[in-house]
Regions:
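Cysteine-nucleophile active-site neighborhood
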Residues: 64-153
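Beta-strand-turn-beta hairpins that frame and shape the catalytic cleft
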Residues: 162-165, 227-232
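Short, surface-exposed beta-strand/loop micro-motifs that present aromatic residues
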Residues: 221-227
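Pocket-forming structural segment of enzyme catalytic cores
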Residues: 112-219
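Single conserved hydrophobic/aromatic residue that forms the stacking wall/gate
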Residues: 237, 241-246
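Hydrophobic anchor at the start of a short beta-strand
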Residues: 30-31, 96, 232
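Extended, subdomain-level signal for the structured scaffold at the beginning of enzyme domains
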Residues: 1-72, 156-158, 164-167, 176-184
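Active-site-proximal beta-strand elements of phosphoester/diester hydrolases
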Residues: 5, 167-171, 233-236
Length: 246
């Protein structure tokens, strides 16, 4: 049976089609679903439930125009209206993928890094990290080199050799992974100890480097993380875009 994938969109999402096509090429059964369909505020035939899917994807874009902060409005809407459903979805062991704006949304929700609470309760956790304005203070859009750092915890990347360097596109203005100073050392160590770091920015030699190789100034060159269980992957890099034909 093909896995069923819910690709969530609202006003401002703009990468749902490339994400849909990427999963379609892999043989999955993917569907682009508007938030209103999950909230049940559409005609009955158009309504959807997270229970119908095996994977939730929040793709890239500028959800709700990224007003207030990138991903903040969509995070609040999901948390307020679908908190129980998200908790049940995670508690059942279903994976979640957040790409770029999806990364921003799920961090805003407090789901990741996910220290301290069982997975089914993390949607009510206090926010533990943030994605802030790039150090360059401008939108960064170009090919980027990332190194796969995970030792096998992340279910999404278990087929990628540790140390493999990938060339992927970045496109963001608020991509700097940030942890407040008083918690920074402890949280970064937890990310390492829990095998939660999935991707880091590198230069062509595979060495951690600053701008322009690190396009945003992310702490510890972090480009992607997962939850302690490895079932939720957040990638700032547009990992679905290279599958799109030109």
């Amino acid at each position: 049976m093909k896995p069923r994938i819910c690709i969530l969109r609202i006003e401002g999402t703009n990468c749902e089609l490339e994400t849909f096509l990427a999963f379609k090429r892999l043989g999955a059964s993917a569907e682009i679903v508007h938030l209103k369909q999950l909230l049940g505020v559409v005609k009955e035939r158009e309504r959807r439930s997270l229970k119908d899917y095996n994977l939730l994807v929040i793709p890239g874009g500028f959800s709700s125009g990224d007003y207030i902060r990138a991903g903040a409005i969509l995070a609040a809407r999901i948390k307020g209206a679908l908190g129980t459903e998200i908790a049940d979805f995670i508690g059942d062991g279903n994976p979640i993928l957040g790409i770029c704006n999806g990364f921003q949304v799920l961090v805003e929700m407090g789901l990741l890094p996910g220290f301290g609470a069982p997975p089914e309760e993390r949607e009510i956790e206090m926010q533990q990290a943030a994605l802030t304005t790039n150090d360059s203070a401008r939108f960064e859009c170009r090919p980027t080199l990332i190194k796969h750092e995970n030792k096998g915890n992340c279910v999404f990347t278990q087929g990628i050799t540790k140390g493999c360097i990938l060339k992927m596109p970045c496109a963001h203005a608020e991509g700097k992974f940030f942890i407040e100073e008083q918690k920074r050392e402890r949280y970064l160590q937890l990310l390492e100890d829990n095998d939660q770091i999935v991707f880091r920015y590198v230069d062509p030699e595979g060495t951690y480097a600053s701008y322009p190789w690190n396009p945003n100034g992310s702490l510890s060159n972090i480009a992607g993380i997962c939850n302690p269980e490895g079932t939720i992957l957040l990638s700032l890099i547009h990992i679905s875009e290279p599958t799109r034909p030109y």
